[in-house]
Regions:
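Active-site-proximal, well-structured secondary-structure segments within enzyme catalytic domains
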Residues: 55-60, 94-242, 312-314, 319-320
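Beta-rich nucleic-acid/ligand-interaction surfaces
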Residues: 217-226, 276-286
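Post-HExxH zinc-binding segment in Zn-dependent metallohydrolases
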Residues: 131-141, 279-315
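Long, amphipathic alpha-helical stalk/connector segments used for oligomerization, subunit docking
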Residues: 298-344
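Glycine- and acidic
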Residues: 78-85, 117, 124-128, 176-187, ...
């Protein structure tokens, strides 16, 4: 019974074990279907490359077009290329959703989303309340700053704000913003070695990362997974990251973010039991990673790490803050979508 075990380490291990096993107590045939479907989707998604006029292009190449290209037709082609992967995996994702919901209902949950939160020790009603409140608090600020962004984009392309199309934005999903204001933030990273900047920064705050970087996969190549993640290999300090580095703000932020995850995992107490030798909770490692990634938007960090001068520092302060503010407001809309979907 709950509360009968007084050894806190043992009690916590039992809770962790229960939550890890709980979602898998389903029919083995259904489990096999889910695993096979997940693998099929991952294979299709990871190997997919969108095409522009029949030529395969990487996500980084699409991003460059959406950041720099003035020709609306070329921008539209790049934006549409970024969406082609959806057509390739959508039917399989729908099948997986149905399988997962079937599994969750076998275990007495409303759907897979609710089950995933419950076994991650989060209450769906509390999470929904938090995000509904967040949306209410940010609706007006988002609306105001989005109007400013649209006015800036309309001016750049010589169109009216109401004529703006999705491909006029730099991010194909409008999950973040890099084009807000008159200052080109990417130019401060152009030609810089993002790997070495990251190494210098982390070593400088007494979180050495040479071992992490040595074993990591950091640069783009044909057929490689195009995004980024961190993986704790053995819970004994062998932590690795995957990136597709390019010399811009986005990949500097991402690199710092992933190493944030990695240094968290690397420095967990080694004398803890194996089951507890991982992040205390997902949101803690994520908070650490966000904190570290955000340094790329910090003028003091930029002055120290990429060498901006005092005059640039003064002009950049507001631009970086506004850029970060709008990016967070934009992404907050994405954070709210899964909750609406789960309760639709």
């Amino acid at each position: 019974a709950k509360g009968t075990i007084k050894d806190t380490l043992l009690a916590r291990q039992l809770i962790v074990l229960f939550n890890q096993f709980a979602r898998n107590q389903i029919d083995t045939s259904l489990m096999r279907q889910m695993v096979e479907k997940q693998a099929e989707i991952a294979n299709k998604f990871n190997n997919f490359r969108g095409k522009i006029n029949g030529k395969e292009v990487s996500d980084n190449e699409i991003s460059e077009v959406l950041k720099n290209e003035q020709n609306p037709k070329k921008r539209q082609e790049a934006w549409e290329a970024s969406k082609q992967v959806g057509q390739a995996v959508a039917p399989f994702v729908v099948e997986l959703v149905k399988l997962r919901n079937q599994a969750a209902k076998q275990l007495g949950y409303e759907n897979y989303y609710v089950m995933a939160l419950a076994t991650d020790e989060q209450d769906i009603n509390e999470v929904v309340r938090i995000f509904d409140n967040l949306k209410q608090l940010t609706d007006e600020p988002f609306k105001h700053i989005k109007q400013e962004l649209d006015a800036s984009i309309a001016k750049r392309f010589g169109i009216k704000p109401q004529d703006i199309q999705p491909w006029h934005y730099a991010n194909p999903f409008f999950q973040e913003v890099s084009e807000y204001g008159e200052i080109d933030l990417d130019k401060y990273f152009k030609g810089k070695n993002i790997e070495e900047i990251s190494r210098t920064f982390y070593n400088g705050i007494n979180l050495p990362v040479d071992d992490i970087l040595k074993n990591s996969d950091l640069y783009p190549r044909k057929g490689k997974y195009q995004h980024a993640f961190c993986n704790d290999i053995d819970r004994l300090g062998d932590v690795r990251i995957m990136c597709n580095l390019s010399d811009n703000l986005y990949w500097t932020n991402t690199m710092l973010h992933e190493i944030g995850h990695a240094t968290y995992s690397k420095n967990i107490q080694r004398d803890l039991p194996f089951l507890l030798r991982t992040e205390a909770h997902t949101f803690l490692t994520e908070a650490t990673a966000i904190l570290m990634g955000r340094q790329a938007n910090n003028v003091d960090w930029l002055q120290a790490m990429v060498g901006i001068n005092k005059k640039e520092k003064q002009s950049l302060g507001k631009a970086l803050f506004d850029n970060l503010r709008l990016s967070e407001l934009a992404f907050s809309r994405w954070r709210h979508i899964p909750l609406q979907t789960a309760y639709a």
